[in-house]
Swiss-Prot record:
GO terms for biological process: RNA processing. Its EC number is 6.5.1.4. It is an enzyme of class 6 (ligase). Belongs to the RNA 3'-terminal cyclase family. Type 1 subfamily. This is RNA 3'-terminal phosphate cyclase. GO terms for cellular component: cytoplasm. ATP binds at residues 100, 291-294. PROSITE patterns: RTC (PS01287). It comes from the Archaea.
Length: 359
């Protein structure tokens, strides 16, 4: 049994999610210790419990240590399954972080998969659901992995109540390598500004602010930010909550950024923050924003051939994913061909193992 130290790197939930996904696919029993050792509340929280339950269901896994606050987990996968599944985090815990653990597994499921998850769609310390819909989904399509994300209802901290459906109609069973080095010319910028259980002007001000910052730095580039808002009598959300996601469609890639509303935070600051983060990442010229560059590493390790990932910033999450891949997928070869220092832009060459479910 492989032992993974959950305190390495960022020492949070990322190690758990990547370990679960890779162990499920490769059929490797793992024991994860020191789970979330570097967090104020160590051990498994509700969102992590749901991640474990979800991957365990799809991998027919036997699990030990599945309880709130547990710092040790044993995960023994016994074969991938397809079908329809339902998971309720029970709080405003992040749906997108559960998806982060689940998505790689669904790419290799024996048949169609549909998963409904209840929790938070737009919550702190995790990618918003619109980032997954409009950025990550497009990047994973380049690996040959296509799926649908249906947002039935948004959920914000602290009440949650969001409902998202993941639908994988045709799991690819094999991933293509990608060359995502430079982004190329920025063709257009799109976005979505939402506000639920709040006045319409919140969504409008977020969008206007983001658009103004982007126009000042990207002259001549078409910019379009849509609004999502609901009449109070027809608003199905628990709310209140708001946020904006913006993404640049470039010749060779898509890069995204986001910002969440918060009590006391002006809507203008929300829009400005999202736009400035996107501009920072675009300024590097790389194909991937600071978030996507860590999320794609496990996929590249499983792909058939050599991928190159050019990231705007080497985050601790990316470094952590590299270390977990080294432990669980030793056949994957990884080397920095540019950069390699934290918080600097980088290019990573990944020679994947051409994983197939029967292998």
């Amino acid at each position: 049994m492989i032992v993974i130290d959950g305190s390495i790197g960022e020492g949070g939930g990322q190690i758990l999610r990547t370990t679960l996904a890779l162990a499920a696919l490769l059929g490797k029993p793992v024991r994860i210790v020191n789970i979330r050792a570097k967090r104020p509340r160590p051990g498994l929280q509700r969102q992590h419990l749901t991640s474990v339950k979800a991957v365990a269901e799809l991998a027919s896994a036997r699990v030990e240590g599945l309880e709130l606050g547990s710092t040790t987990l044993v995960f023994i996968p016994r074969g991938l399954r397809s079908g329809r599944f339902y998971f309720n985090i029970g709080t405003a815990g992040s749906i997108t972080l559960v998806l982060q653990a689940l998505l790689p597994v669904t790419a290799f499921a024996p048949g169609p998969v549909e998963v409904e998850i209840v929790g938070g769609t737009d919550v702190p310390w995790s990618p918003p659901i619109d980032y997954v819909r409009f950025v990550l989904r497009k990047l994973l399509a380049m690996f040959g992995f296509e799926f649908e994300i249906i947002v039935k209802r948004r959920g914000h901290y602290p009440r949650g109540g969001g409902r998202v459906v993941l639908r994988v109609t045709q799991p690819p069973h094999v991933l293509k390598p990608v060359k995502l080095e430079e982004r190329g010319k920025v063709l257009r910028v799109e976005g979505l500004s939402h506000a639920v259980r709040l006045p319409r002007h919140v969504a409008e001000r977020q969008a206007r602010s983001a658009e103004a910052v982007l126009r000042s730095k990207l002259p001549g580039v078409p910019i379009s930010i849509d609004l999502e808002w609901y009449e109070p009598s027809r608003d199905p959300h628990l709310g209140p909550g708001s946020g904006v996601v913006v993404w640049a469609v470039a010749e060779h890639s898509v890069l995204g950024s986001d910002s969440l509303g918060a009590k006391g935070k002006p809507a203008e600051a929300v829009g400005r923050e999202a736009a400035e983060k996107l501009l920072e990442d675009l300024a590097t010229g790389t194909a991937l924003d600071r978030h996507a560059s860590d999320m794609l590493i496990p996929y590249a390790a499983l792909a058939c051939g050599e991928s190159i990932l050019g990231g705007a910033r080497l985050t601790m999450h990316a470094w952590t994913n590299i270390e977990v891949v080294k432990m669980l997928v030793p056949g994957a070869e990884m080397e920095f061909i540019e950069g390699g220092k934290l918080n600097e832009k980088f290019k990573l060459r990944v020679k994947g193992i051409c994983y197939k479910p029967s292998s």
